[in-house]
Amino acid sequence: MPDISRFQSELVRFFSESGPGSRPVFPDVNEGDLCLWTDGSALGDARQLGTGGGAAFVVTLMAGGVEHYVISYAERLDHHSDFFDYGVTVNCAEIKAINNGLSYLQKLDCAEDATVHVFSDSAYAVSVLSKWVHVWERSERKQESCAKSGWLCADGWPVANARLIKDTHRLQQIFLRVVYHKVAGHAGYFFNEHADNLASIARNGQLSDPLAADFSWSDQKAKSVRFDYASGKIALEEY
């Protein structure tokens, strides 16, 4: 198992010497925690069949008492995806953004030791992934003996986009802890605004580079953090 303390201490040292940051906005985000700011966008609304959309996430790291930008990513969503039962809607775009972010973070060597805070302005996504997914799982276990699905809404209809929700829940279980925070949209949270902007750009097909190469802060180019366990050194890649 990788030594996450080594990873964290190296990042704290690195960021204390260089790199701009943003003050944390939530007191329960602790040193070394990863923050995942997400947003989804669709051409239709949550009740209509979408024809396409966008999903984006921004990763930050709490180090030295400051929230530091790590990387951002966005993609255009195709309504033909097997993940989407009814095309791309706002609701499934919001969950796909979280799915993409967790999928990226699970590639880290320290994923199983990491606490991830997911910030979303979607009450639906936060409620589904922090509460209802557990209700449906318990119901499914109870229904196994009679070969019925436990993934049903209160009105008896199947849960929409169940495959996407199940896959996102699978990713959640890789980490030590995943904590969800519902934030107000367009309320001045910098990284939430950035994710919202990227999702809209991706939805409109205007994003040529999914790694959002145009992002900058304090006249510095966006950087992706890489930690080499062999050398114990931090490496930054500019886009």
Predicted feature locations:
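Short, surface-exposed amphipathic charged segments that create phosphate/polyanion-binding patches used
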Residues: E193-I201
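RNase H catalytic domain
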Residues: L43-D45, H80-F84, I98-E193
